[in-house]
From Swiss-Prot:
Residues 151-197 form the SOCS box domain. Keywords: Cytoplasm, Growth regulation, Isopeptide bond, Phosphoprotein, SH2 domain, Signal transduction inhibitor, Ubl conjugation, Ubl conjugation pathway. It holds the Pfam family SH2. One of its GO terms (molecular function) is growth hormone receptor binding. The lineage of its organism: Eukaryota, Metazoa, Chordata, Craniata, Vertebrata. It comes from Mus musculus. The SOCS box domain mediates the interaction with the Elongin BC complex, an adapter module in different E3 ubiquitin ligase complexes. PROSITE patterns: SH2 (PS50001), SOCS (PS50225). Residues 1-75 are annotated as: Interaction with AREL1. This is Suppressor of cytokine signaling 2. The modification Phosphoserine is found at S30, S52. There is a cross-link at K173 (Glycyl lysine isopeptide (Lys-Gly) (interchain with G-Cter in ubiquitin)). It comes from the Eukaryota. Substrate-recognition component of the ECS(SOCS2) complex, composed of SOCS2, CUL5, ELOB, ELOC and RNF7/RBX2. Interacts with IGF1R. Interacts with DCUN1D1. Residues 1-29 are annotated as: Disordered.
Amino acid sequence: MTLRCLEPSGNGADRTRSQWGTAGLPEEQSPEAARLAKALRELSQTGWYWGSMTVNEAKEKLKEAPEGTFLIRDSSHSDYLLTISVKTSAGPTNLRIEYQDGKFRLDSIICVKSKLKQFDSVVHLIDYYVQMCKDKRTGPEAPRNGTVHLYLTKPLYTSAPTLQHFCRLAINKCTGTIWGLPLPTRLKDYLEEYKFQV
């Protein structure tokens, strides 16, 4: 998955990529820059965003990983910001995430794009497809007609996430109603910062 810039190739991608770390106050940012900065903050909390990494480095990291293991990295393509690298039955491959009109979706051929679900954040997109893969995958299935099935099942972490983050993931997997839990408001606020299961 690769995050596609709204700008044409060349300096546009570099300019937009630099907005991920925009230094200004939120009121100084354009709504687009604020959305991208928020998306990166959320993505950086995951532990599976690897930042700058080449295609070959991603392949090396995923080479011995089980099928369905994935990571997100900066794209080496000038028209995109992010790429998801995932291990398939045929080896590691890369997918693009497109960003348009404030929404993220998988990159695809034009005739399918309008049918693809769109998300407010990259993490929401990944969380959705991980959950979808859990629901659909019943076991190893031999590809037919040369087709390779692609599953997102397990993130490859840059380093072990904190125990707090693992606890937050466990709570998110058990309930969707954080504010109904008998917890202090400060802890509920922490849980609300990252509402995903992956």
